[in-house]
Amino acid sequence: MNKLRTVLAITVLFTVSLWCSAQEAVVNIASYNIRQHNTHDSIQGNGWNVRCPILAQLIRYHEFDVFGTQEGFKHQLEQLKAALPGYDYTGVGREDGIDAGEHSAIFYRTDKFTLVDHGDFWLSETPDRPSIGWDAVLPRICSWARLKHNDSGKEMLFFNLHMDHIGKQARIESALLVQKKMKEFGEGLPTFLTGDFNVDQTHRSYATLISTGALNDSYLTADFVYALNGTFNDYCTDCFSTSRIDHIFVSPNVKVDKYGVLTDTYRTAEPDAEPNYSANAPEEISIIPHKARTPSDHFPIVIRARF
């Protein structure tokens, strides 16, 4: 009888193990340049303390599972984390490898993922320490995480960066360096690379990322694309661009169901604005002029992916 129970227990465990290994991991992956906190933005009405809760609501509504942020200072990341129950993040400051300067942080839902390993490296000839690489004008950092999808037991790699806005050589070399690091940290694993690359889909460093076949642009491989604008808006709600400077790249073993540029906006009150009434609406309905604003000077991009 005991032998029978043992055999049954082993059979059940084996079956569960097979089921978990066969189960697909379906995830919402995003990239969001949240714009660094600065006085000029506050004067213009785009201050971080106004934008932060709106950013958090957007993230929660669209159900980001894992997302990379760019430009955030430590206090911004802590405020965002406080507004996102059930999320944690990893990533260090680019100036000192601790807290100073902008971060390329990775946020993830703790109910869906377990952080297995993580780290950071600089986009330079000396990636193991804070440094400026090649012809860049600022130190640039890439943070990475190895995450286990709790339901399926599958693991994935996630890289997030912010490339230099001036250095052309730096962007190309950074693209090569990141691909080298991907092989070091878990070749063969489903891999995501998010970030503000400071170049659109027509530039050489973009081509460097997809030319080897190790990465695909999710915009090009998604079954469905919803992208009514580019990804940089400069806080202009009336502007349009075809340039995608924020990207989500995926390894070939990741299937992308859909891709979207989320052009959500919000409104702030205008001084002395008078309510308008329309003959086409009930009399109790008034429309009050407000200023349209974007939660950041970049739109977030998000994909639904499976592996």
Task: Give a label for each model feature.
Residues V66-E155, F159, K258-T263:
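Structured beta-strand-rich core segments of catalytic domains in phosphoester-bond hydrolases
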